[in-house]
Design a protein with these regions (language model features):
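ATP-dependent adenylate-handling ligase core
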Residues: 288-290, 298-301
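Conserved G/P- and acidic residue-centered "switch" motifs that form tight phosphate/ATP-binding loops
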Residues: 269
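Conserved beta-strand positions in the Rossmann-like core of class I SAM-dependent methyltransferases
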Residues: 294
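PAZ/PAZ-like end-binding module
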Residues: 273
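Enzyme catalytic cores with a strong preference for nitrogen-chemistry domains
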Residues: 1-265, 277, 281-290
Length: 301
């Protein structure tokens, strides 16, 4: 809690090497069911930008979008708990303003079914904003009231879960993950829709020149050598999806051209075998006799 004039704000503090870099106020205050934050706090939408004296340091508290740039050049933003559950989370604007990492400080309680929904929500938000989304929730012992906290900690990269905490642990946990910021930047450059959405988005940027990782870098994340080939049950689903996409594409072409025959070069390899299976399935779905499939063997290949 940070007092500003006669108001009280629910804030996150960004601190690096003993220096308070800035404060970010919570935007969306839940006031339903077991939540009653509006009894105490004021939304960031209802304040004006102001300098705040706290812990012996003066920092700027903005009423708009605030980003932080590290000494390594990474841009990150912060939102708090309920913010990500809103229809238009602050992280949308943070990402469009340039944030590559989003940090969420949360006190979201546990309810039946809420955990799986939360994971889906964070994955979608990370993918939609093309960010690394780092979520840290309250854990065991952080409440004496009528709620339970599970100690959820997640690190997502463009929708993919990289690291997570042990749920309901009675011990303190540190969740560590490595995100590929260059990859996120590349994905954004390739996505014209993301660039088009950035028009008119501005933000205050607080710059810290101290390097975040002065020591030598050590790669600890797992890099899949076969990123396009899943393992386990998902492999069957992926192959079935590919097969049906091919069938749908061929069916559309045959229907459009009113073709009654297809001609295949059969070499005996995997490619021509798959092509033959796709043709057979397509003809069956279109109720066309398989006699219209003409295979030409090519033993020289």
């Amino acid at each position: 809690p940070v007092p500003v004039g006669g108001l009280l704000l629910n804030c996150a503090a960004v601190i690096h090497k003993g220096s308070l870099l800035g404060l970010v106020a919570k935007t969306y205050l839940p006031n339903y069911k077991e939540f009653y934050e509006k009894r105490w706090f004021t939304s960031a939408k209802d304040i004006s930008s102001v300098d705040v004296r706290i812990a012996g340091q003066t920092v700027h508290l903005s009423s708009g979008t605030t980003l932080f740039r590290t000494g390594d050049g990474a841009l990150f933003g912060v939102e708090i708990c309920e913010d990500v559950w809103a229809v238009t989370p602050p992280s949308n604007r943070l990402a469009l303003a340039g944030a590559e990492l989003i940090f969420n400080l949360s006190a979201s309680n546990e309810l039946i079914g809420k955990h799986s929904y939360l994971m889906s929500l964070l994955s979608q938000q990370s993918a939609r904003t093309m960010t690394a989304y780092i979520y840290s929730g309250c854990g065991y012992g952080e409440s004496t009231q009528d709620v339970v906290y599970g100690g959820n900690g997640f690190i997502y990269e463009n929708g993919v879960l990289l690291s997570r905490s042990e749920r309901f642990s009675f011990k303190q946990q540190l969740v560590i993950g490595q995100v590929d910021i260059e990859r996120l930047r590349t994905e954004r450059r390739l996505n014209s829709t993301f660039a088009a959405s950035q028009c008119g988005i501005i933000a205050d940027v607080i710059i810290d020149t101290k390097p975040v990782t002065p020591r030598d870098f050590e790669l600890i994340r797992s890099v899949d050598p076969h990123p396009f080939v899943p393992t386990g049950p998902e492999l069957d689903n992926r192959c079935n999806e590919i097969f049906n996409i091919q069938v749908a594409g061929l069916a559309k072409r045959i229907t459009h051209t009113h073709a009654e025959n297809v001609v295949l070069g059969i070499s005996g390899g995997l490619d021509s075998t798959l092509a033959l299976l796709v043709c057979s399935k397509t003809f069956d779905k279109l109720n066309i006799p398989r006699s219209g499939i003409i295979g030409i063997t090519m033993p020289g290949f």
